[in-house]
């Protein structure tokens, strides 16, 4: 399904510098994540969503990245409390370890937990977000069973401009950010810094024995930067960096105020060179770090857990008489340190090939990849997709693909509870979709079946083993367009996420969930409402601890004072709905946020 949130121009180099396109206001939405090569989002065979900067700003600083993702088709979110607390993202019913997170093409996340710190990535530093639902290991390797979410940081172009934002709201929430961006034909640059803080509320409630009634503060300081230098036509050198440092309080009883300090960072440098009219080479290398320090009653001086990922990629894009060829080599070195517990590492060497083509009414995509992991050996994955334009307004498309997840370092080596003999989890997915677009309206329907085997689960002695299986089957329906002067987007998901061995529903997955957004621009004023609904869930495996369904209504407004200044406001959870996404953990009640933005056009 394609939800095109904007037709504004996108600078493709932001995700994969090899794929730069000239900016222009008449360009359609572009994605690179679906194929690792630039293409129109509405022509992607993979189930793809692109969230542009306008939509991110509309979400407002009172929204987090996980909350924004949860408003997209096929995605569910659960959180252990309010802002900055541990958050899980599920795509099409897969678990949180089955989503690969990229920042400007670089992997970012914890190799000990197997998940990303979604809650710590600030929206103020993001230019756009690309979401690919379905298996993507044939493009990106391990962990892309449910899909890939890629964050693209802010870039610069045109005359140098300063931009800034300041805002405040409920729960003692406040945010400030500022940046500068600009560029010429030879050089482009951007830099932005920000800080946010909230007094928040108690992460837990009385259902849990570790409940503490105090507010669990969260704060986040962040920075991003980007540059690109073009010394000659067809040649470009550049890089980007994202850094976010946070502190989050959490409940662990009344006798101690526990908190953790975390830092997420990702940087990369690249060289893109068009050697001939048909051949472009891109070399990129960089590093990401997930650094976590916990201060608790059992560790008053702090306990550090750190993941470092060094990454190298050499990609070749070759234009063929029919279609385009992709060939690449990657090297990934992962090192994880759990203070006083283990200090381990592994390396992965990967080779991949891909071919995409449009032949008349036919669209094709083929990908194959082999990953050789020093810990568990080799894995080969593949993807085949086909689309056919039945009518100028109607397309049918389908795909099959395999994927896998690598065991985490905790699962492998945690003292007394690790299993170094673990193998990778495997997945095989089939899907088919219909897409209709006419007169500014688009409708889509996607059906998928994903079978995951060799799942890692704990035995009766809490030792992880490859013993479980899952069946995920669902339908995603979507609409985007304009009705009676209102911009409208909507999605509805039906999901059957089962443990294949017990027949029970998987934990924290709803069978039905939906999103609706309606907005209207009246001269300088933009008004909108949003609604997100979810069916019931179970907090634990084997359908233990039921969680009720819920619906949350939000409203927002923006008024442009002139070409440079605007005032913004949001009212979240208007009806003050009390609900939980995880048993015993609170969610925000009714709250407001107002801000002033300076952004010269």
Regions of interest found by a model, annotated:
Residues 66-106, 127:
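Extracytoplasmic beta-strand/coil segments of soluble accessory domains associated
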Residues 322, 358-363, 449-451, 466-541, ...:
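Gram-negative outer-membrane beta-barrel transporters
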Residues 212-334, 443:
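Outer-membrane beta-barrel domain signature, strongest for Gram-negative TonB-dependent receptors
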Residues 28-60, 88, 96:
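N-terminal periplasmic "start-of-domain" segments of outer-membrane beta-barrel proteins
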Residues 186-189, 199, 234-237, 275-283, ...:
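Repeated loop/turn-to-beta-strand initiation elements of outer-membrane beta-barrel proteins
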Residues 255-274, 305-310, 374-377, 389, ...:
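Outer-membrane beta-barrel signature, preferentially recognizing the C-terminal barrel domain
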């Amino acid at each position: 399904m394609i939800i095109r949130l904007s037709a504004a121009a996108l600078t493709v180099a932001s995700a994969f510098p090899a794929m730069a396109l000239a900016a222009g206001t008449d360009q359609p939405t572009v994605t690179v994540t679906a194929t690792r090569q630039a293409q129109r989002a509405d022509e992607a065979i993979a189930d793809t969503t692109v969230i542009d900067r306008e939509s991110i700003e509309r979400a407002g600083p009172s929204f987090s990245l996980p909350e924004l993702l949860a408003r997209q088709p096929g995605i569910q979110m659960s959180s252990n409390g309010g802002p900055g607390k541990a958050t899980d993202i599920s795509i099409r019913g897969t678990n949180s370890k089955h989503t690969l997170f990229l920042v400007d093409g670089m992997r970012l996340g914890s190799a000990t937990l197997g998940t990303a710190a979604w809650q710590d990535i600030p929206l103020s530093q993001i230019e756009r977000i690309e979401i690919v639902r379905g298996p993507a290991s044939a493009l990106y390797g391990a962990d892309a069973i449910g899909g890939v979410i890629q964050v693209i940081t802010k870039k610069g172009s045109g005359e140098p401009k300063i931009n800034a934002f300041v805002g405040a709201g409920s729960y003692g929430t406040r945010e400030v950010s500022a940046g500068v961006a600009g560029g010429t034909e030879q050089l482009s640059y951007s830099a932005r810094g920000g800080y946010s803080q909230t007094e928040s509320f108690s992460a837990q409630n009385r259902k849990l024995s570790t409940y503490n009634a105090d507010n669990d503060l969260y704060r986040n300081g962040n920075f991003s930067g980007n540059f690109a230098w073009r010394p000659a036509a067809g040649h470009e050198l550049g890089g980007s960096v994202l850094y976010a440092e946070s502190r989050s309080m959490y409940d662990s009883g009344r006798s101690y105020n526990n908190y953790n300090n975390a830092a997420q960072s990702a940087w990369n440098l690249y060289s893109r060179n068009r050697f001939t009219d048909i051949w472009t080479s891109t070399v990129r290398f960089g590093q990401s770090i997930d650094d976590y320090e916990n201060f608790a009653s059992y560790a008053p001086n702090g306990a550090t857990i750190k993941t470092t990922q060094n990454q190298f990629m050499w990609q070749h894009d070759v234009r063929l008489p029919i279609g385009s060829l992709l060939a690449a080599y990657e090297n990934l070195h992962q090192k994880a340190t759990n203070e006083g517990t283990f200090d381990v590492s592994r390396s992965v060497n990967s080779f991949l090939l891909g071919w995409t083509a449009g032949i008349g009414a036919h669209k094709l995509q083929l990908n194959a990849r082999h990953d050789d992991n020093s810990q568990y050996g080799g894995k080969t994955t593949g993807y085949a997709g086909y689309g056919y334009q039945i009518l100028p307004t109607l397309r049918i498309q389908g795909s099959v693909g395999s994927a896998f997840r690598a065991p985490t370092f905790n699962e492998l080596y945690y003292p007394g509870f690790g299993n170094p003999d673990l193998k990778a989890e495997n997945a095989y997915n089939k899907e088919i979709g219909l897409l209709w677009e006419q007169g500014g309206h688009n409708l889509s329907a996607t059906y998928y079946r994903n079978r995951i085997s060799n799942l890692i689960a704990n035995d009766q002695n809490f030792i992880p083993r490859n013993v479980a299986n899952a069946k995920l089957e669902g339908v995603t329906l979507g609409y985007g367009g304009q009705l009676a002067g209102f911009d409208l987007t909507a999605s509805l998901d039906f999901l059957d996420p089962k443990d294949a061995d017990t027949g029970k529903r998987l934990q924290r997955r709803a069978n039905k969930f939906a999103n609706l957004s309606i907005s209207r621009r009246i001269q300088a004023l933009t008004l909108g409402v949003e609604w997100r609904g979810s069916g019931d869930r179970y907090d634990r495996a084997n359908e233990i601890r039921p969680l009720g369904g819920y619906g949350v209504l939000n409203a927002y407004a923006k008024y442009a004072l002139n070409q440079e200044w605007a005032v913004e406001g949001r009212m979240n959870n208007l009806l003050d709905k009390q609900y939980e996404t995880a048993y015993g953990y609170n969610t925000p009640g009714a709250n407001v946020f107002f801000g002033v933005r300076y952004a010269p056009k």
